Structures are given as structure tokens and as C-alpha cells.
Amino acid sequence: MKRFICFFLLFAVLLCPAASAEPLRDGDISISAPSAILMEKYTGEVLYEKNAHERIFPASVTKVMTMLLIVEDIESGKLKLDDTVTASARAASFGGSCVYLEEGEQMSVDDMLKCIAVVSANDCAIAMAEHISGTEQLFVERMNRRAEELGLEDTHFTGCTGLFDDGEHYTSAYDVAVMSRELIGHELIKNYTTIWMDSIRGGKFELSNTNKLVYWYQGCTGLKTGYTSTAMYCLSATAERDGVEYIAVVMHGDSIESRNNDAKALLNYGFASYTLCPLRGAELPDIPVELGRSGSVRCEYDGGEYALVPKTGAEPEYELTLPER
């Protein structure tokens, strides 16, 4: 059936805000990290960027992609949360952030994913990569294919943990925001990334989230921290309030405190300054047709469901313009 496109004009009471948000310039907000970005989830609008396409070693923020592949396999039915994963000698040998898997130790996919999301467990990331693809190398090849599918031009992975900087493992704040947006599109992951404290092994091993925003930032939904001496302090922070969700990525911060403060400043700006306006509230009338096979055709919505508009103190309005018959 032939479709007619409906065009929307968004109006405030006194001024007409742009349907797409106007990004902040560097200097409009104080961000100490050398690279950062603020993106809105539903529209993908970028509200702030600072050296957002600079290639940087991301440390454990790498695991945003690792978790994305795991969650996609769970939701496609390739994996089940109660599947058993057996730790190899290689997985058990990994240090850094870990839960001290022993060779041959068995753990469910559910617990493995929890450990990756909450404490950034390198050993669990390796165990899951081997369980899914046979070897970490094959899993990493899949990570890079997925990055290409997402259009990430400044990303290349050589491992699934982000523990080692070999000069060929890099991403950018923008690319992290895009893959984070894809990940939080799967509500399942928030069952893990919003955990503050939990335990595994029947309560014998306690877990405490490396992302402290989960505890003290209202609406925080995740997502992933990272640190090495070369990557410094990195973070992809996500938060949702009143139906609007933002992704704040901070790369190469000089401390946990400054990293968290930068993310908080970006998220606060987003929540204070913008809102989502739904564009598909009204039922569309049929359009009369002259000299056609039928007397009318159905008019269907085309384009996005929401527009991100500045908060002006007034309720956003939209005007629906139908095409000529």
C-alpha cells in the first residue's frame, strides 16, 4: 500500500526549537577529561563532544562490546542464562579485575555475565569468549565484525578484556557511546549493570560494583568502568529519568573522582536541558484520493518516534502537516 510521509514541525510557545538538539561547544561545560561525549539514547543525538573521535585505549570499557555479544546471543537463543561455562586454564590465569576462577570451575552464564558487569572480571570475560567462540581470538574477530556493522570507524579490538595495550586495541568516546547505546537497547543487561552489591559461589564471594554512580546517581543504569596505567580512568555511564536516557562517556580521566564528576556533569546537563517529544500520538486520518483505484489511502508515520527538544518551561507541541491529496 502506498504510504504518505507525515512531516512534523515542533513549536514552543515563544520560539520554535530545532527538532535536533544543538550540541554544546567545548567550554560551555567544564569537563576535565581530554575526551568525552554525551549522547541521548532514543534519538542518538550528540549534545556534547570533546575530542570524541580520538582513538584511545579503553581498558575495561572494552567489555561493553563483550557484553553486547553475550546479550545478543542470549536473546537470540544461542545462549541460556542457566548454561554451564567451564573455566579453562587460560581463563583462570587472568589477573587484574577478576573473581579468581580456578581451572575447571563451572559457573552459569548468569553468574559469568554478572561478574563481568559488576566487577569487570577478566577471567569471566575470557571464559565466556571461549565458551561462545572456542577461542578468544575468534571471539575478538566477531567483536570487530560487530563494530563494523555498527559503523564504528575508530575502533579495533585485539582482546575481549581491555587488559593489554598492544597499540592496536583502541576505540573512541563516540564509538563507545554508539556501542553503549546498542547495549542498553537490551533491557536484560540492566539486570546486571544496576547491581550495587551481590555475591557468587553461594554467597562465599562478594561483588561490589566498580561503577559507584550506580549507588549515588539517581537513575543510573550502568554501564562500564575501565582503568589501566595507560588508559587512565575511563567510563561509559548511562542514566534514565522520566523516560529519557543519556550516555556519558569519559576517556582518560586522571582519577576516579574526576571521571565520575565529568560523567555526572554531562548527565546533569542532559536532564536539565532537554526532553523527548513524542511524534506519534495522534491517530492519522485517511487521505482522499482523486482518480485512484480506491477513494482513500492510509496515511502512515515515517521517521522517528521522538524528537529531542530543549526544555523551555512550556509543553512541546507539534504540528502535523498532511500531503496534498
What are these regions (language model features)?
Residues 9, 13-17:
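Hydrophobic core
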Residues 1-9:
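Positively charged n-region of N-terminal signal peptides that target proteins for export
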Residues 152-156, 164-325:
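Domain-terminus/edge residues, biased toward the C-terminal soluble/receptor-binding domains
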Residues 15-16, 76, 278-281:
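Residues in and immediately flanking transmembrane alpha helices
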Residues 2-3, 41, 50, 63, ...:
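Basic side chains
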